[in-house]
Curated annotation (Swiss-Prot):
May be involved in regulation of vesicular trafficking. In vitro, does not bind calcium and phospholipids. It comes from Mus musculus (Mouse). The keyword Magnesium does not apply. This is Double C2-like domain-containing protein gamma. Ca(2+) 2 binds at D274, D334, D336, D342. GO terms for cellular component: membrane; presynapse.
Length: 387
């Protein structure tokens, strides 16, 4: 049995509808007909929306009380990358001195996991590459979410080839040691492809920090480097090549002393050989073939570092024509107490070398009293002695 429609073209109104009141802003007043606010449905028929009244549409609209709209959240707050804050810094590729300078200025709007103040520092890494070999950091600024560092971090031995293939990663980290907290992930990080840099021209950045994307370190890398306990934290799974590091050597033929001065200045980005992620490096020098004079030297050991500075100089007596027929073998080792030292990398300078190694050797012996400093990439195999 069909339900009868409302008489006189009007819908029936229930007692609940009569008891409704208007809660819009302004004086409280009852609602005469709630159907004017909501569609009216009959209990036994298909829901039918009320047809619009054409005359009411043509009549002038009665202004109603203004409705309060919720304030939309700032656009940046809805994005995780911009909610972590921003970092201001400047990069300068000093091509003449083979150096990359990164000046960390300040951070703004940091969002630490815990309430209150935070102690922060900036950590830098060159990717791809060994994590600790290229890791630099600023000092810690305490008790603020708007830290100002104004500190410059310098990567030595940085070349145009590095600028074309490497990326600089900057992380804003909380120094949990000062507050005896458990070390957590960085507050935010960013990455800058260094191919964008113009040599000898500073460039400033103000970039939003992002969440760090972490994966487990490949076990093959740890095993190959003897690094089974290298890092407990998760690091980037960027498989870098077998780059063993670089060494800065200076050569000068002294006409006054009648011999070759070899300076071992520094090494950078050495391969870690110890379980703690570092090495105890030193450098060995050998002039081959030996003429019975002093031909072997070695530097002192630098403890627990992958970027050692030596600044030590050694002398090989001999005429330029005699030295031109010889080869200088330079090797970097990791010192181990009680066991055999581990080979890190080496380089050979001679008339039979090629590239920068050959140029370094020829220019040194071709010009007296001319000191020439050049960076050399270390080979992963020990230098071979010729006949």
């Amino acid at each position: 049995m069909a339900c009868a429609g409302p008489a006189s073209g009007r819908h029936g109104v229930s007692m609940q509808e009569h008891m409704a009141i208007d809660v819009s802003p302004g004086p409280i007043r009852p609602i005469r007909l709630i159907s004017n606010y909501f569609p009216h449905f009959y209990p036994f028929l298909e829901p039918v929306l009320r047809a619009p009244d054409r005359q009411a549409m043509l009549a002038p609209a009665i202004p109603s009380a203004p409705q309060l709209q919720p304030n939309p959240e700032p656009e940046g707050d809805s994005d995780d990358s911009t909610a972590l804050g921003t970092l201001e810094f400047t990069l300068l590729f000093d091509e003449d001195n083979s150096a990359l300078h990164c000046t960390a200025h300040r951070a703004k709007g940091l969002k630490p996991p815990a309430a209150g103040s935070v102690d922060t520092y900036v950590k830098a890494n060159l990717l791809p590459g060994a994590s600790k070999a290229s890791q630099l950091r600023t000092r810690t600024v305490r008790g603020t979410r708007e830290p100002v560092w104004e500190e410059t971090l310098t990567y030595h031995g940085f070349t145009c080839q590095d600028a074309g293939r490497k990326t600089l990663r900057l992380c804003v980290c909380e120094d949990s040691r000062l507050r005896r907290r458990r070390r957590g992930p960085p507050l935010g990080e960013l990455r800058v492809p260094l191919r964008k840099l113009v040599p000898n021209r500073a460039r400033s950045f103000d970039i939003c920090l992002e969440k760090r994307k972490l994966t487990k370190r490949p076990k093959s890398l740890d095993t190959a480097r003897g690094m089974s306990l290298y890092e407990e934290e998760e690091v980037e799974a960027e498989v870098f090549g077998e780059e063993r590091g670089r060494i800065l050597l200076s050569l000068c033929y002294s006409s006054e002393r009648g011999g070759l001065l070899v300076g071992v200045l520094r090494c950078v980005h050495l391969a870690p050989m110890d379980a703690n992620g570092y090495s105890d490096p030193f450098v060995r020098l050998f002039l081959h073939p030996s003429s019975g004079k002093k031909s072997k030297y070695k530097t002192s050991v630098r403890r627990k570092t992958l970027n050692p500075e030596f600044n030590e100089e050694f002398f090989y007596a001999g005429h330029r024509e005699e030295l031109a027929q010889k080869a200088l073998l330079v090797s970097v080792w990791d010192y181990d107490l009680g066991t055999a030292d581990d080979f890190i990398g080496g380089v050979q300078l001679s008339g039979r070398a090629s590239g920068e190694r050959l140029r370094h050797w020829r220019e040194c012996l071709g010009h007296c009293d001319h000191r020439l400093e050049l960076w050399h990439l270390l080979d992963s195999v020990p230098p071979q002695l010729g006949d």
